Structure formats: structure tokens, C-alpha cells
Curated annotation (Swiss-Prot):
Cofactor stoichiometry and binding remark: Binds 1 zinc ion.
Protein's name in the database: Endoribonuclease YbeY
Keyword Zinc on entry: yes
PANTHER family (alphabetical): ENDORIBONUCLEASE YBEY, CHLOROPLASTIC
HAMAP family the record matches: Endoribonucl_YbeY
Superkingdom of origin organism: Bacteria
Keywords tagged on the record: Cytoplasm, Endonuclease, Hydrolase, Metal-binding, Nuclease, Ribosome biogenesis, rRNA processing, Zinc
Subcellular location: Cytoplasm
Higher taxonomy: Bacteria, Pseudomonadati, Chlorobiota, Chlorobiia, Chlorobiales
GO CC term, one of those recorded: cytoplasm
EC number: 3.1.-.-
SUPFAM superfamilies: Metalloproteases ('zincins'), catalytic domain
Amino acid sequence: MTMPLQIYNTTRRELAESVLTEVVTTVLQEEGFLIESLVAVYCGNKMIHRINREFLGHDYPTDTITFSYSKGSEIDGEFYISLDAVEENALRYKVGFDEELMRVTIHSALHLAGYQDGKDEERVQMQEKEALYLKRFVTPST
């Protein structure tokens, strides 16, 4: 029997896969979706750059790429997250790696739930949702 959510880590960095599973599942359930089939791949810049170039025509690495094949309220899709980009973002935004990893994972799940970030108003709505979910999963560092 296959699992509805499969997580693959192609890097040497250790990840708390059970926490990532909980984050993705919670976001999608609370947005009104069930996971039919979802693959989450945590990779490096080299892999995500290749995917970005081949499938989206963008010749640069990015933090996340999401592909949705969903119909209705059942999620069928995949997302890729570059841990190199997550690390760069964490330094840029002066947050911990784990917090930024949660944010990008939430961001990916929100894309699967239909949220977009191409326009300013869409980006603001998505950032508000990210902040809402992030508060639940990240303990503020003091």
C-alpha cells in the first residue's frame, strides 16, 4: 500500500520528516483538501535549477516549485524545495533554517491548495496564510 504523502530528501541534511508531514497535512486539511497522492522532494539548487529550466523555462534556482494535478478537493501533485535556497533565505531574512523550511513548506502546500503569488494582492494573501500557519508550527526563538 502506498502512502498518500511521500517525502524524499536527496540531500545529506537531516530533516524532521514527521514534522514536515504534519505541516503539509494540516495546511491542506484546514484549507479543505484531502491528500490523494503527494510527493515532496527536498533537494539542492542543482536539481531545482534543472527542473525550473526544463519545465518552467527559468534558468535559475528557486526555493520551491509546485506541480498540481488535482481535481476538486483531492490533492494530487508534487513539490520540490531547495534546501540551499532555504538556507540562503534564512540568512537573508535573519531567521533560523527550520523556521524558513517550515515557511517554504507551508508556501508549497498553499500553492497545492490553489493560492497564487503572481500579483501583489495574491502575494499578500499568501503571506498572511503562511504567517498564520507558521505561528502554529514554529516556536519563536528568544
